A protein has these predicted regions:
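Carbohydrate-binding surfaces of carbohydrate-active enzymes
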Residues: 1-59, 72-76, 83
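Short, flexible loop/turn segments at beta-strand junctions in immunoglobulin-like
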Residues: 35-37, 108-111
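Short, aromatic- and glycine-rich surface loops/edge beta-strands on solvent-exposed regions
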Residues: 43-47, 78, 114-126
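Edge beta-strands of extracellular beta-sandwich domains
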Residues: 54-57, 92, 128-136
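Aromatic/hydrophobic beta-strand junction motif of beta-rich domains
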Residues: 61-70
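Extracellular Ig-like/FN3 beta-sandwich strand-entry sites
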Residues: 73-75, 101, 114-116
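Short amphipathic beta-strand segments in non-cytosolic proteins
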Residues: 77-94
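Aromatic sugar-binding surface patches on proteins
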Residues: 96-107
Length: 136
């Protein structure tokens, strides 16, 4: 196997906003992308009709209202971090939005520690994210 890198041009059947699906990097708009790769590396691209926006999050009690400016359907990963800084896997969730809007209620337990919780909302393609606070 030859590890030498070479430039490869990828031509897609449609034009759109191109993302590197392995890193979340936005590569631009069009129907082609050129990358330098070796046989030891892989590439995976996504062509979307619209560019993915950073999520807009509003907190009301323990409920998150999540939307994006473009109104695109997308998927968000929601992570909850305790006041001690530990990610709480039991509250990690995926949220599929319709028309760019979705809602997630965090089902905190009565035994959860009091304090400020950080909620990280991540758009899964572009990996753009925002942080929100919820106080118990």
């Amino acid at each position: 196997m030859n590890p030498k890198a070479r430039e490869i041009r990828f031509q897609f059947p449609v034009s759109g906003h191109i993302y590197d699906a392995l890193t979340g990097s936005y590569l631009g708009k069009g129907d082609t992308v050129t990358r330098t790769l070796s046989r030891m590396h892989s590439a995976l691209f996504l062509v979307a009709p619209e560019r993915f926006d950073k999520p807009i999050v509003k907190v009301s009690g323990m409920t998150l209202d999540i939307q994006n400016k473009s109104g695109n359907d997308t998927v968000y990963r929601i992570e909850v971090i305790s006041p001690a800084g530990k990610k709480l896997d039991c509250y990690t969730q995926k949220l599929i939005t319709k028309n760019g809007k979705g809602q997630y209620h965090i089902p905190f337990a009565l035994s959860d520690a009091k304090g400020d919780y950080t909620v990280k909302v991540i758009e899964v393609i572009s990996r753009q994210h925002v942080l929100a606070k919820i106080t118990l």
